[in-house]
Amino acid sequence: MAKRRMFSIEIMESDAFCSLPASAQSLYFHLCMNADDEGFVDKWKSILRYLGVKRGMLDFLINAGYVIVFGEDVLLIADWRRHNTIRLDRYSKSSYVHLLNTLDVLPNGRYIKAFGDFLATQDK
C-alpha cells in the first residue's frame, strides 16, 4: 500500500465535484487514499463505517461517475490515472488487475466500463 497519493486539481476543484455533499467528497478522498496502485478499493465498507457516512454518499459518487462498482466487494476510482502516475519501481500489482480487461480508458485517462466496439464506432 502506498503511503502517498496525488489528486488532480482539475477534478477536485471542478464544479461537478464541489457540488457533491461534503461527506461524499470526504468519502472520495478516503477511497483514493486507500486504493491500490490501479485505483481499486476493496475495503470501502470499512471506510464508510469509520467515517460514519451512509451508503447513499457512495451512491452520489457512483451516479456522478467518480466510482465504478464491481459486484459487492470492489470499487474502482474512475479518474485514478488522472490523479496518480506510479513509477514502475514503486508499482505493486493489483489483486484485481483482471478487472481492467472489462474497462476502456478514455484519452484523458478516465476508466469507463467497456461497451465492446461502441467507443470505436463513435469515433468514426
Kindly give the residue locations of the regions a language model identified:
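Short secondary-structure capping micro-motifs at structural edges
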Residues: 15, 45-46, 62-65
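Generic detector of isolated residues embedded in canonical secondary-structure elements
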Residues: 26-27, 46, 60, 76
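Short, well-structured alpha-helical interface segments that form or flank functional binding sites
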Residues: 22-26, 42, 53-59
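Winged-helix/helix-turn-helix nucleic-acid-interaction surface
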Residues: 1-11, 51-124
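Short recognition helix of helix-turn-helix/winged-helix DNA-binding domains
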Residues: 1-38, 77
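Short acidic, hydrophobic short linear motifs in intrinsically disordered regions
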Residues: 35-51
